[in-house]
């Protein structure tokens, strides 16, 4: 269909600035900030938002999904096991049975983060990309929010002061680096927090330890996903993701209990 499109430059700029300002004013105070939009973070966001919790996901890259997109060594599939498959099915993700392995399923490594992200957004969560958490708000021995910066500014090495977001709870789902907990430990050595990092691969051990390691490790700060195993020196798992999704769900449930939702 041919037609005349209206594309006034000033109107475009005004629209972006106005809507962005309104968005930021609404996000300065939230219930939960999730740092890292990988598999566990997106899952936690979905379950929190479904219960009406004001949830904000901050992802440093321009796309969410973490390491899911690349599947296993670039092969575009991931593996998920029972009962975590139900989490993906609830987001409308198609799964394929594995011959001879009744507990295992494969899923498209592009479809999974795309649909899980949409499920979180549709539930009411807000996802912001290109934002890095460089510090935490620590008041009276409790985490009360995050200190954020543009990832582009950080990468450029520019000296620009950050801004803050207030939150009742913060989730570190940044993955292997456990960057939020590591920042807390580095800047507040008197707290005695250490991040030993994950061990080498042992898929079954790593998967089964994820939900056990998902917990509040400091007042107001939760760990889930690979951050939980990095903090507790658990094993890595590779391209099997069931534990990640179950960890995200458990983290949401723990916070919902705190919020009495």
From Swiss-Prot:
Pfam families: Thi4. Belongs to the THI4 family. GO terms for molecular function: iron ion binding; pentosyltransferase activity. The keyword tRNA processing does not apply. HAMAP family: Thi4. The lineage of its organism: Archaea, Methanobacteriati, Methanobacteriota, Methanomada group, Methanococci. Fe cation binds at residues 161, 176. Pathway: Cofactor biosynthesis; thiamine diphosphate biosynthesis. GO terms for biological process: thiamine biosynthetic process; thiamine diphosphate biosynthetic process; thiazole biosynthetic process. Gene3D superfamilies: FAD/NAD(P)-binding domain. Glycine binds at residue 236. It is an enzyme of class 2 (transferase). Involved in the biosynthesis of the thiazole moiety of thiamine. Catalyzes the conversion of NAD and glycine to adenosine diphosphate 5-(2-hydroxyethyl)-4-methylthiazole-2-carboxylate (ADT), an adenylated thiazole intermediate, using free sulfide as a source of sulfur. Keywords: Iron, Metal-binding, NAD, Thiamine biosynthesis, Transferase. It comes from the Archaea. NAD(+) binds at residues 40, 59-60, 67, 133, 159-161, 179, 226. It catalyses: hydrogen sulfide + glycine + NAD(+) = ADP-5-ethyl-4-methylthiazole-2-carboxylate + nicotinamide + 3 H2O + H(+). This is Thiamine thiazole synthase. Homooctamer; tetramer of dimers. Its EC number is 2.4.2.59.
